[in-house]
Curated annotation (Swiss-Prot):
Short sequence motif named QXSXEXXXL, residue ranges: 6-14
Protein name as catalogued: Probable minor pilin MMP0709
A Pfam match: Class_IIIsignal
Disulfide bonds: none
Up-regulation conditions: Expressed under standard laboratory conditions at 35 degrees Celsius.
Keyword field: Fimbrium, Secreted
InterPro entries given in the database record: Class3_signal_pept_motif
Domain notes: Contains an amino terminal motif QXSXEXXXL, which is part of a class III signal sequence.
């Protein structure tokens, strides 16, 4: 087995072990670790649904695709580099709702196919998405840290899959304590993995 393949398996096993153990993990990723100093490719594409509290009825086999761009911004400033968006597709009737972040105010924007726009305040309790996996693609010359231990990124990506015995886990975006900081949190069975993008 190649070192790259072995590393990838070891990383997944490590993450799964941490999730099952119930401990808290903080994974700090600087903006410089991503191509063009941004989160270019943080995406999830699988058959799953939003939680009902998110404002969309949870529908079996609904396709959710998340793409995150530059998220280390101040939501209260009139900026244009806020590139977070998510698309909810009901595979039963093919209706689509897209989600984005307000460039001026800390709101989550829901855009419906009929042109209706609904703004939801973004706060620490921003509701969860449900995912079966999420991939962070990073530049090969950077490392990430899990529980204080550096993990080589030779495979150029960091993939987290659902814990053993689970088909999915929840993740959410929420504002941090500092101005312009956002956090992507993966939550499953009271376990949180936090990606701090600063």
């Amino acid at each position: 087995m190649s070192n790259r393949g072995q590393l990838s398996i070891e990383m997944v096993i490590l993450v799964l072990a941490v999730l099952v153990s119930g401990s808290y993990v903080a994974l700090d990723l600087s903006k410089g670790a991503f191509e063009t100093t941004a989160v270019n490719d943080v995406q999830e594409s699988s058959y799953c649904g939003f939680t009902p509290d998110f404002g969309a009825t949870s529908i079996d086999k609904a396709l959710v695709k998340l793409t995150t761009g530059i998220i280390n911004i101040n939501p209260n400033a009139a900026v244009t580099n806020n590139e977070f968006n998510a698309t909810y597709t009901n595979t039963t009737d093919n209706t689509v709702v897209t989600y984005s972040l307000d460039n001026v105010h800390p709101n989550l924007i829901k855009n419906y196919a009929d042109g209706t726009i609904v703004k939801v305040p973004l706060n620490e309790t921003w509701k969860n998405f449900t995912a079966s996996n999420i991939i962070l693609r990073m530049k090969s010359d950077y490392v990430c840290t899990i529980n204080g231990e550096n993990v080589s990124m030779e495979s150029n990506c960091f993939e987290i899959t659902a814990p053993l015995g689970s088909d999915s886990f929840d993740f959410q975006m929420s504002a941090g304590t500092g101005a312009g900081q956002y956090y992507l949190r993966l939550v499953d069975q009271e376990v949180t993995i936090e990606f701090s993008l600063e």
